[in-house]
């Protein structure tokens, strides 16, 4: 278990960025940021903040987010592997997942079968947990 020195972090983001952090699979905003930021934290929206709440008034809306460390964290040898795996998948997010899986597991085709994934899916259709499992399998090879 990882030890954190805090119970909760509160951050304010531009609303569009907060929407990307909070997005779930199959939504248009879902991507690397959603997966990477939700790996270590349970993230919840607290409130949207109107530009009229500030002086001078910004041209964008803001969102307050709560980040609570996860108690049961998916363990990686190196978080850079998760960054690499998500980059491979989301560089061509409109393509099917067969190509990035072949890039990651080119010498171990049986691992693709072991993951038991529908190869006709696109990266935005895979859950965060699926990306964590793919990364763990990738780490076992490198």
Task: Identify the role of each PLM range.
Residues 131:
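Short, Lys/Arg-enriched alpha-helical microdomains
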Residues 134:
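Intrinsically disordered, Lys/Arg-rich low-complexity segments
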Residues 1-123, 128, 139-142:
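Class I S-adenosyl-L-methionine
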């Amino acid at each position: 278990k990882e030890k954190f020195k805090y119970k909760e972090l509160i951050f304010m983001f531009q609303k569009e960025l907060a929407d990307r952090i909070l997005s779930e699979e199959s939504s248009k905003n879902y991507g690397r940021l959603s997966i990477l930021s939700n790996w270590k934290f349970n993230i919840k929206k607290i409130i949207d903040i109107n530009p009229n709440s500030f002086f001078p008034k910004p041209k964008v809306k803001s969102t307050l987010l709560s980040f609570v460390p996860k108690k049961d964290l998916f363990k990686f040898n190196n978080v850079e592997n998760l960054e690499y795996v998500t980059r491979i998948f989301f560089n061509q997010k409109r393509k099917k997942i067969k190509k990035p899986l072949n890039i990651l597991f080119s010498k171990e085709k049986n691992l693709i079968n072991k993951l038991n994934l529908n190869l006709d899916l696109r990266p935005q259709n895979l859950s965060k947990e699926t990306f964590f499992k793919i990364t763990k399998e990738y780490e076992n090879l490198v």
